Each structure stands twice: as structure tokens, then as C-alpha cells.
């Protein structure tokens, strides 16, 4: 279970237990990582549908979209390796690379 880190509240005890978000992830996937760790340790991961959050300015991904796509997919590889082991990461690597390539191809301007 995981929720978007765009708006995240966590108990201080959970932060002490796991430390902060894993800085090896660049901008993406650290919330998934933290959520999986919390879930495996027996913490509840809760979505509050009545909460309203406005992300007024979000331009990080727009500045260098290809670099952000690559960073996201590198983070996915790290996530698989961290949580499921080297063998799973080796199996997942071609799929992650293919998905990265496909996303980048869709993002290219037309002919």
C-alpha cells in the first residue's frame, strides 16, 4: 500500500523507525518505498478522501522531462532491487527499460 507523497502525514514514531524518505530515489518512488516499509511493519496506510490539497505550483517535471522520466525508471529499478532482491531486479530491468523508452517515444514531438 502506498499513497502519493505530494501530501503525506506520518507519525513521528514511524519516521524514527524508518528514518526519512530514502534519498537514493530522485523525486519519485520514495513515497512507494516508505509506504511498503510501513505496511510490512504493520502500520496502517490510510487515504482520507475528505482532505483537500492544492498543489499550486509544480514545475519540477516540466523543466527536463526526459531526465525526469529516466530518474523515475531508475528509481523503479532501485525499488524492485531493494524490496524484492537482485534476481527480481534483473528480471524487471528489461521491462523497466522498455517502459522508459516507450514513455520517451510518446513524449517526442510528432513528425
Model feature map: region roles:
Residues 15-16, 26, 54:
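Nucleotide phosphate-binding site architecture
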Residues 9, 26, 33:
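A short, conserved beta-strand element in the Rossmann-like catalytic core
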Residues 29, 33-110:
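Active-site-adjacent helix/loop segment of glycosyltransferases
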Residues 1-17:
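A recurrent flexible, glycine/aromatic-enriched loop bordering the glycosyltransferase active site
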Residues 20-23:
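Conserved nucleotide-sugar donor-binding catalytic segment
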Amino acid at each position: 500500500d502506498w499513497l502519493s507523497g505530494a501530501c503525506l502525514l506520518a507519525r513521528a514514531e514511524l519516521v524514527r523507525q524508518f528514518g526519512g524518505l530514502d534519498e537514493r530515489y530522485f523525486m519519485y518512488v520514495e513515497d512507494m518505498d516508505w509506504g511498503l516499509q510501513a505496511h510490512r511493519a504493520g502500520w496502517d496506510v490510510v487515504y482520507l478522501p475528505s482532505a483537500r490539497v492544492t498543489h499550486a505550483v509544480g514545475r519540477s517535471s516540466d523543466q527536463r522531462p526526459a531526465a525526469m522520466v529516466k530518474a523515475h525508471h531508475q528509481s523503479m529499478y532501485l525499488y524492485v532491487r531493494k524490496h524484492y532482491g537482485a534476481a527480481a531486479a534483473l528480471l524487471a530491468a528489461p521491462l523497466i527499460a522498455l517502459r522508459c523508452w516507450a514513455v520517451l517515444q510518446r513524449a517526442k514531438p510528432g513528425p
